[in-house]
Amino acid sequence: MVRSLVRRLLGRSQNNGTAAPALELPPEDSRARARAMVMGLQDEICAGLESLDGEGTFVEESWERPEGGGGRSRVMREGLVFEQGGVNFSEVQGQELPPSILKQRPEAKGHPWFATGTSMVLHPHNPYIPTVHLNYRYFEAGPVWWFGGGADLTPYYPFLEDARHFHRTHQAACDSVHPDLHKVFKPWCDEYFFLKHRGETRGVGGIFYDYQDSSGVLYKGQDPSGPAAGVSAQLGARPLGWEQLFALGQANGRAFLPSYAPIVEKRHPMAYGDRERQFQLYRRGRYVEFNLVWDRGTIFGLQTNGRTESILMSLPPLVRWEYGYKAEAGSREALLTELFTKPQDWLGDASLEDRCRPHGAIN
C-alpha cells in the first residue's frame, strides 16, 4: 500500500503542480523479481561449479541480520580444482543509509532502503587458473533505484586467449541488451579494480557498472577525466528502463560459467611447481589489499552491520607478502606484472600477440 501511494504521488504531472520524476518507477514486484534473479544465479552458478570441480561441494549457512534481512553463504573448501570459493546471496534493508551510499546518491537520504545481490570469488589450487569474481545487485531507497554489477578475472600467469575469451563472452552479454554498454563498462572495470597504492589493476578486468537507472547516464564513477567517463560523454545518454537493466544483470550473470569454465578445463591439467605456487601466493596479496582498502562492497557491508564472515569470504585461504619483490626480467612473472596488470584493449589490440608469443603466453 505504501509503495503504491509513493508511486501515485511521484507520478503526478506538472499540471498538478509537481514536477514529473526524473526516473522511471520500478514495477510493483521489483524487489521480489530482483531477489529471485540473484538467488537463481547463486543456484545456477553453484551447481555449475560443483560439476566443474568434480569433487568439491558447497556447504550452505543461512544467516539473519538483526536490522532486517539476511542471506545464505555457500563455501567450497579443498575441492579438486578450487582451494576455496564462496558464493553469497544477501537481502538487507534498513532505515538509515550508510555514508558510502549517501556520498554517491545523496537524494536517497531519509528513505528506507532495500538491497539484494549475489557475489562470488573463487581461488583455485593451480596457479595457471585465474581467480575470478562476480557481483550483481539491486538497490531501492524511496524513489531511487539502481542496478550494479560486474565480473573480473585475475590471472597469476598470463594467457592472452584466456583474457580474450572472458572479455568476449561478457561483451556479447552486454551487447544483447545494448551495443554501447560494453564500451563504457570495460574501461570502468579497469578503473574500479585498480590498486592506487600499487599503480596496477587487480587483473585483466572484465565489466563493471553501478548506479544504473533510467536516467541514461552510463558512467557514474569517481573519475570524471578517465577513459570510461570520456566514452560515456561521447556516446551521450542511453536511457534504459528497469526491464532492460534487469535483463543486463541476468544476461551477464548467466554468462559467467561460459566465460570461466573453458579456462578452468584448459588450465587445470597443467603441471606446476613451487615457483608457480609461491608467485600465486604473492599475487594473492594484491587481492587482499584491494578488498580491504578499496572495495566499496566490503566497505558497504561493514558499514551496514553485514555478516563479517560472508563479507570477508572473498579473501584467499593462504597468501604471502614479500618486501621489495621484483620479477626476473624476461620471465612470465614479469610479463604478468608488465602487461596483464595494466589496462589493455584485449579484443582489439593485435600487438598483444607479439608481446605474449615469446613467453608462450597466447594459448
From Swiss-Prot:
Coarse class of the protein's main subcellular location: cytoplasm
Amino acids binding substrate: 119, 135-137
Gene3D superfamilies in UniProt: Coproporphyrinogen III oxidase, aerobic
A GO CC annotation given for this chain: cytoplasm
Subunit structure: Homodimer.
Database matches in HAMAP family: Coprogen_oxidas
Known role: Involved in the heme and chlorophyll biosynthesis. Catalyzes the aerobic oxidative decarboxylation of propionate groups of rings A and B of coproporphyrinogen-III to yield the vinyl groups in protoporphyrinogen-IX.
Protein name: Oxygen-dependent coproporphyrinogen-III oxidase
Gene: hemF
